């Protein structure tokens, strides 16, 4: 939705995975992780070279990595808008399960446990480095999105 709204290039390794034969409708997601990451980095480099608007989804639970990425975009002349969808771990786990049941994309529940609490802390650590940001929350089904806090003109 954001990429379409802003006519932006979506640079997402999960999207890349879908075109790799070894992905096997989601069952080989972990198998193609490194390959999809490499391909996505090339897509990102091309988008930057073209001056495209970019949507770059990232879990972002390591603030130092997130800030480094934000700095890279700023160094390339980009305005950095940070979006964070806040949700309790049980909701995130439910969405992960739904993603598997509906799309065949398997990710271990440990992905949620590993990031639990860290993503919000990371957002707090880097939000003021962004040109604009938004923290939003929604119902478990994704409806009724609410803005919790924001800075700048982001959406």
Please tell me what each predicted stretch does:
Residues 60-64, 87-91, 114:
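Short beta->alpha linker loops
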Residues 10, 82, 133-135:
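Conserved beta-strand scaffold positions in the cores of enzyme catalytic domains, especially
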Residues 31-84:
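Glycine-rich phosphate-binding loop used to anchor ATP phosphates in small-molecule kinases
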Residues 94-155:
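Conserved GTP-binding G-domain of TRAFAC-class P-loop NTPases and closely related GTPase folds
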Residues 2-52:
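Conserved substrate/cofactor phosphate-moiety recognition/catalytic segment
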Residues 15-18, 86-91, 139-142:
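Conserved nucleotide-binding/hydrolysis micro-motifs of P-loop NTPases
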Residues 79-85, 104-109:
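Short hydrophobic alpha-helical runs that function as membrane-insertion/retention elements
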């Amino acid at each position: 939705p954001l990429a379409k709204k802003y006519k932006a290039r979506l640079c997402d390794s999960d999207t890349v995975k879908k075109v790799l034969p070894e992905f096997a409708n989601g069952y080989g997601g972990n198998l193609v992780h490194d390959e999809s990451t490499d391909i996505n980095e090339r897509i990102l480099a091309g988008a930057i070279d073209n001056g495209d608007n970019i949507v770059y989804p990232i879990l972002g639970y390591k603030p130092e990595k997130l800030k480094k990425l934000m700095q890279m975009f700023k160094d390339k002349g980009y305005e950095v808008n940070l979006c964070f969808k806040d949700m309790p771990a049980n909701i995130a786990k439910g969405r992960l399960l739904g993603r598997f049941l509906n799309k065949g994309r398997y990710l271990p529940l440990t992905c949620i446990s590993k990031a639990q609490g860290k993503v919000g802390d990371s957002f707090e650590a880097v939000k003021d480095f962004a040109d604009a940001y938004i923290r939003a929350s929604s119902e478990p089904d994704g409806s009724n999105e609410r803005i919790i806090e924001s800075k700048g003109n982001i959406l």
